[in-house]
C-alpha cells in the first residue's frame, strides 16, 4: 500500500523519502457508528434510535530510514512541513491497485528521537470529519447533464401533417460506490422556480420565487447545504418542504422541472463515488 499526505509519499520503495509504514493501519474499516439507545422501563429489552456515522480516526505508524543523520533530519522536517496545515489530503493506492481519497485534518504527529542515527519512528493521527472514503480513480469523479422534463404530444391548434413531440425521461445517475453520496448540482442560464428531484429517494429541492437570466450560474451543494447564485447565497428561496437529498448506491432517477416553457436551463449533477471502508 502506497500512501501520500498532501503529496508527500510514504511506503513507496521507488520514492527517495524512505518512509515506510508499519502494521496495523487503523481507521480504514467501517466508520464509528453514533447510536442513541436506552433500556425500556418496566419491561425487558431496549431501543436503538437513528444511527449515523461519526468522524473517522486514522492512525499511521512507521519508520524513517536514511543513509546519514543529516538526511534523516531532513526527512523529519519534510514530513512535518507536509502535514503542518489543518487540511490533509490522504491518498491511498492499495496492493490491489485501487485508489482512494480521504479528506482529513491533522490530530497529531509524534517523531521520537532514538539513539540510532539512521532510523526513527513516527506516528500520525488524522481525523476525517467526512467518514466517506472516496474513489480516486479516473472513473471516480463523475458528472451527468440533466435537461428539464417536457411533456410529449401535439401542439394546438393542430397543423397538418401532425407532429407528435416525444416526452423526456428522467436522467439516470449511477453511484458506483457502496456509500450514500451528496452531489453538487450546477444549473445555468434562464430558469423560473427550478425543482430538481431524486425520484429514487422521493425527495426534491425547490427554489420558489427565483428567476434567472442567460449567463447566470446556480450552484446547489447538497453536502455543505449551500445555494449560490453567481457566488451569492439565495438560500431564502428554498421551500420548507425541500430536502438536501443524496444519491443512493446504484441507479438514481433525477428529474428537473421549471415553471416557464421558455426556460433554457440545464443542470449538471457532479459527485465522487465513495465507500464505507476499504
Please identify what each model-predicted range represents:
Residues 1-55, 103-111:
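Solvent-exposed edge beta-strands and adjacent loop segments
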Residues 4, 63-109:
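Short, acidic/charged, Gly/Pro-enriched secondary-structure junctions
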Residues 64-66, 108-110, 128-132, 189, ...:
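Beta-strand elements of well-folded, non-transmembrane domains
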Residues 52-56, 82-84, 116-120, 177-179, ...:
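Solvent-exposed loop and beta-edge segments used for protein-protein assembly and interaction
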Residues 89-136:
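Short beta-strand and beta-hairpin "edge-sheet" elements
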Residues 74-88, 136-151:
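Charged, amphipathic alpha-helical segments and their flanking helix caps
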Residues 139-278:
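Intrinsically disordered, low-complexity segments enriched in serine, threonine, and glycine
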Residues 45-70, 118-132, 252:
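Oligomerization/assembly interface segments of phage tail-like spikes and tubes
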Amino acid at each position: 500500500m502506497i500512501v501520500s499526505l498532501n503529496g508527500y509519499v510514504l511506503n513507496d520503495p521507488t520514492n527517495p523519502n524512505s518512509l515506510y509504514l508499519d502494521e496495523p493501519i487503523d481507521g480504514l474499516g467501517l466508520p464509528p457508528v453514533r447510536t442513541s439507545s436506552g433500556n425500556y422501563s418496566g419491561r425487558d429489552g431496549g431501543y436503538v434510535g437513528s444511527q449515523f456515522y461519526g468522524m473517522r480516526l486514522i492512525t499511521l505508524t512507521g519508520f524513517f530510514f536514511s543513509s546519514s543523520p543529516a538526511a534523516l533530519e531532513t526527512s523529519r522536517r519534510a514530513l512535518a512541513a507536509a502535514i503542518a496545515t489543518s487540511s490533509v489530503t490522504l491518498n491511498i493506492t492499495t496492493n490491489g491497485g485501487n485508489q482512494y481519497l480521504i479528506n482529513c485534518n491533522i490530530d497529531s504527529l509524534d517523531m521520537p528521537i532514538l539513539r540510532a542515527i539512521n532510523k526513527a519512528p513516527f506516528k500520525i493521527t488524522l481525523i476525517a470529519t467526512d467518514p466517506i472514503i472516496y474513489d480516486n480513480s479516473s472513473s471516480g469523479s463523475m458528472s451527468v447533464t440533466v435537461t428539464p422534463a417536457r411533456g410529449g404530444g401535439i401542439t394546438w391548434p393542430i397543423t397538418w401533417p401532425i407532429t407528435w413531440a416525444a416526452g423526456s425521461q428522467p436522467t439516470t445517475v449511477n453511484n458506483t460506490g457502496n456509500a450514500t453520496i451528496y452531489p453538487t448540482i450546477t444549473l445555468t442560464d434562464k430558469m423560473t422556480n427550478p425543482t430538481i428531484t431524486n425520484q429514487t429517494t422521493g425527495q426534491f429541492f425547490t427554489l420558489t420565487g427565483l428567476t434567472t437570466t442567460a449567463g447566470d450560474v446556480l450552484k446547489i451543494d447538497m453536502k455543505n447545504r449551500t445555494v449560490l447564485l453567481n457566488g451569492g447565497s439565495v438560500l431564502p428561496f428554498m421551500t420548507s418542504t425541500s430536502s438536501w437529498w443524496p444519491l443512493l448506491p446504484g441507479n438514481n432517477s433525477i428529474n428537473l422541472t421549471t415553471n416557464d416553457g421558455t426556460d433554457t436551463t440545464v443542470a449538471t449533477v457532479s459527485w465522487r463515488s465513495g465507500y464505507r471502508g476499504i
